[in-house]
Swiss-Prot record:
GO terms for biological process: translation. It comes from Corynebacterium aurimucosum (strain ATCC 700975 / DSM 44827 / CIP 107346 / CN-1) (Corynebacterium nigricans). NCBIfam families: rpmH_bact. Belongs to the bacterial ribosomal protein bL34 family. GO terms for molecular function: structural constituent of ribosome. Residues 1-28 are annotated as: Disordered. Residues 1-22 have a biased composition (Basic residues). This is Large ribosomal subunit protein bL34. Keywords: Ribonucleoprotein, Ribosomal protein. InterPro entries: Ribosomal_bL34, Ribosomal_bL34_CS. It holds the Pfam family Ribosomal_L34. One of its GO terms (cellular component) is ribosome.
Length: 47
């Protein structure tokens, strides 16, 4: 039986658009994520 293809196909533009700072800030839930990461002291807030 053949295995499926690898599901992670890296693409920086897609990564930024899905998980980037501006995308996060555009929704209330996204802002909550950034706030939680700031509170925790994460070096990286978003992708």
């Amino acid at each position: 039986m053949a295995k499926g293809k690898r599901t992670f196909q890296p693409n920086n533009r897609r990564r930024a658009r899905k998980h980037g700072f501006r995308t996060r800030m555009s929704t209330r839930a996204g802002r909550a994520i950034v706030a939680a990461r700031r509170k925790k002291g994460r070096a990286k807030l978003t992708a």
